[in-house]
């Protein structure tokens, strides 16, 4: 590395925390050491530190460096209170922070050097982006409170002496936000961009059109927003939102100022119901049904008609308005999950296949993609599509975004096409669970831990060595089906997006997950300054003799039991047994707790900053065995009654009188119909099944179900009413004698949170408290 300073002297002085007047000088543990994320390519720590004071000038060489200097001076003023002078200068000066751009720097496009000593700091970027990232690194050398939007009383604002040479491993470091399933405001978008740029993520993939909503103004087609941006939810309420073109420009500029390039996505030829509901003539059969913006998740069978030339004129018109709003090189056209059933029926599509000499509907999709590619080429844009664009042949210059595992990315790279890796199997679908589904907010499925995201390597061994340069990077996808609020979106995104940032920036040999966990403690405090609702691992209960969690908030026992806790990564657990709320100073959990009486144990995880996770209250109820009843002549199954009506939850049919009686063999049959992914098939009804369940032996039993309600021995036992009950989060236990026990089960056919209950598996599962495995309640266990 070039030497920017001759001497690095004096003793290292770290930041001290003072959160309130009078100023404290207590050393904050999370501010100890070097806490840069992502870990730089090369870092050498020197002796001493540079003290940032109100008199520290920011000197900049050249106009671009001056703009960046002003940006960071304003940011530093908010937390330090210092009005740091910003001046143009052709050379460094003692006591200053000097910024410059040097295109001859022997680093990649976004590379930078940073050197600090007690005499001063110099940050050199090969480009403006490199200089910006160097200054983000400088902020991470300061105490975490530097991210505060308001004045913080600190004993010292010190920058440790370091020599850093850094550049990213990959050029594409991305994060996807889905504003179609659930909308993000302009301010939400700006905050997310701020957070991405802090950790050197340089691409924001903006998913703007979907079956569930069209979110961008198109002046030539006003119904796309007056109709296509709105849907009627399962509870009858309207949900909507869209961005005007002026708002798009505002967000794009905001991102550009922070060196984040926005990649827009306009979905075609599938995922198009937002457009089709607005203009039905875009589909193969405009008069077959009443088209509405989809209010359930999943994929619509109706897609853009590939046989009509008017469809391509619509696509051209949309691109003519959208492309100029986004100056980046990439434009995403989707291309995924496009059902071919309508094309097979459509005479226009079949004529297109014949006229163009195409083999089948897969090649018809490829035809659509190639035409979109040519439209984008007029603007000098590179087309990106999901890996389904490989079907039927790949457009010549297309970049593949590989999401269905790595197979598509491997195939495309070995063919010589550029690839962006984003496989769910690699942990990069960060809308997936990151903890026990029994206690975490509902998610679509699956399990993506922080360590799994961090450990992902975007270059699979199956790519031949001379084709590996085609892997341009990786992206974390934040699909929003179950992200009902902005805080919930943040909870899914962070800290996993931070793990992705290091996975795609830091050289493979420099990655160290344990050290990343240490540095993350500092990053958490930075997120706190931005009021981010990030995920803190919750205390979970493992199944007996297992590491698999199946947490339980109501534990019935007859003699004694125990409470064993674990977290998805090392973090201190605190608890109380007197009913009080835990604090950072509460008793630390070190070993299983012995429980011999009825009580409530409250548990939480606590970070080094003192911040607590959500508190879990676990009720322990010492019970006598609930007696069984005698059935003289049990008849297999459950008696049912069914009522059709505008029902949303169990409370809605309390006064219903239009019941039809029947019998079912299992609880699975309480769901009378199976929805085949079409919102028009949804039937609003309630089904109640009553009878008895046979318990095989005395003991405490845990029950789990996604049904709306389960009554046991005449009492409401499990209540999922009104929830998106995709994965049971209300498991409960009861001490039961062997034999028959009265039960009632309630199923309500409705759409809640975009999830139709007709997609539920309405089985009931049970296990003994001491067992590690659930079993399904079978027909042999039910009678009336």
What are these regions (language model features)?
Residues 383-388, 393-398, 404-553, 558:
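Flexible, acidic glycine-rich loops studded with aromatic residues
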Residues 105-330, 371, 375, 475-479:
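Feature activates predominantly on carbohydrate-active enzymes
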Residues 20-24, 59, 511, 517-642, ...:
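Short, compositionally stereotyped local motifs that mark structural "simplifiers"
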Residues 295, 299-397, 403-411:
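Active-site neighborhood of glycoside hydrolase catalytic domains
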């Amino acid at each position: 590395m070039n030497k920017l300073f001759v001497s690095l002297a004096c003793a290292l002085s770290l930041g001290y925390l003072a959160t309130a007047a009078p100023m404290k000088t207590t050393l904050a543990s999370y501010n100890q050491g070097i806490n840069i994320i992502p870990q730089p390519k090369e870092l050498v720590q020197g002796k001493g530190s540079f003290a940032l004071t109100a008199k520290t000038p920011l000197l900049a060489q050249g106009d671009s460096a001056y703009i960046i200097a002003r940006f960071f001076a304003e940011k530093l003023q908010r937390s330090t209170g210092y009005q740091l002078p910003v001046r143009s200068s052709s050379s460094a000066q003692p006591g200053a922070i000097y910024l410059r751009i040097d295109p001859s720097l022997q680093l990649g496009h976004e590379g930078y050097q940073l050197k600090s000593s007690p005499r001063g700091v110099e940050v050199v970027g090969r480009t403006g982006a490199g200089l910006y990232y160097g200054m983000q690194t400088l902020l991470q050398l300061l105490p975490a409170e530097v991210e505060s939007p308001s004045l913080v009383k600190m004993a010292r604002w010190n920058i440790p002496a370091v020599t850093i040479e850094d550049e990213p491993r990959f050029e594409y470091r991305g994060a996807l936000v889905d504003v179609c399933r659930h909308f993000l405001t302009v301010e939400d978008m700006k905050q997310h961009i701020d957070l991405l740029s802090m950790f050197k993520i340089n691409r924001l993939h903006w998913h703007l059109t979907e079956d569930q909503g069209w979110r961008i103004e198109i002046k030539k087609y006003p119904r796309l927003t007056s109709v296509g941006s709105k849907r009627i939810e399962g509870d009858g309420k309207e949900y909507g939102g869209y961005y005007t073109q002026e708002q798009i420009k505002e967000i794009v500029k905001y991102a550009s100022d922070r060196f984040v390039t926005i990649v827009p996505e306009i979905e075609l030829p599938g995922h198009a119901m937002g457009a089709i509901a607005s203009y039905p003539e875009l589909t193969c059969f405009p008069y077959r049904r009443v088209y509405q913006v989809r209010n359930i998740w999943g994929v619509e069978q109706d897609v853009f008609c590939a046989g009509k030339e008017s469809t391509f004129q619509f696509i051209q018109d949309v691109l003519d308005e959208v492309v100029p709003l986004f100056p980046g090189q990439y434009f995403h056209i989707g291309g995924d999950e496009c059902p071919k059933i309508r094309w097979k029926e459509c005479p226009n599509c079949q004529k297109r296949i014949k006229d163009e000499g195409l083999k089948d509907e897969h090649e018809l999709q490829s035809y659509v993609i190639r035409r979109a590619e040519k439209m984008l080429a007029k603007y000098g844009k590179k087309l990106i599509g999901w890996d389904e664009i490989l079907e039927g042949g790949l457009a010549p210059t297309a970049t593949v975004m590989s999401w269905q595992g790595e197979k598509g990315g491997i195939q495309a790279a070995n063919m010589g096409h550029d690839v962006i890796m984003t496989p769910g199997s690699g942990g990069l679908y960060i809308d997936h669970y990151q903890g026990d589904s029994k206690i975490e907010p509902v998610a679509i499925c699956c399990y993506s831990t922080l360590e799994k995201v961090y450990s992902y390597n975007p270059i699979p061994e199956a790519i031949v060595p001379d084709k590996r340069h085609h892997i341009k990077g990786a992206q974390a996808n934040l699909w929003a089906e179950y992200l009902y609020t902005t805080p919930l979106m943040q909870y899914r995104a962070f800290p996993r997006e931070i793990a992705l940032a290091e996975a795609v920036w830091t050289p493979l040999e420099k990655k160290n997950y344990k050290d990343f966990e240490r540095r993350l403690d500092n990053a958490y405090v930075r997120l706190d300054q931005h009021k981010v609702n990030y995920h803190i691992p919750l205390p979970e209960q493992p199944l007996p003799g297992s590491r698999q969690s199946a947490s339980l908030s109501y534990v019935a026992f007859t003699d004694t039991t125990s409470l064993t806790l674990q977290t998805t990564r090392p973090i201190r657990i605190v608890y109380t047994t007197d009913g009080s709320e835990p604090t950072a100073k509460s008793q630390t959990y070190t070993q299983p707790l012995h429980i011999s009486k009825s009580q409530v144990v409250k548990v939480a995880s606590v970070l080094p900053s003192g911040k607590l996770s959500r508190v879990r209250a676990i009720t322990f109820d010492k019970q006598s065995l609930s007696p069984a009843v005698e059935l003289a002549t049990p008849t297999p199954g459950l008696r049912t009654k069914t009522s059709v009506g505008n029902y949303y939850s169990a409370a809605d049919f309390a006064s219903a009188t239009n019941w039809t009686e029947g019998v079912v063999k299992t609880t699975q049959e309480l769901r009378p119909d199976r929805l085949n992914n079409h919102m028009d098939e949804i039937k609003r009804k309630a089904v109640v099944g009553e009878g008895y369940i046979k318990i095989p032996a005395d003991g405490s039993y845990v029950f789990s179900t996604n049904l709306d309600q389960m009554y046991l021995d005449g009492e409401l036992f499990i209540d999922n009413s009104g929830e998106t009950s995709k994965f049971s989060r209300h498991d409960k236990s009861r001490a039961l004698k062997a034999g028959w026990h009265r039960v009632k089960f309630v199923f309500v056919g409705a759409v809640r949170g975009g999830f139709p209950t007709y997609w539920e598996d309405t089985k009931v599962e049970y296990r003994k408290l001491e067992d590690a495995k659930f079993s399904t309640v079978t027909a042999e266990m039910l009678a009336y």
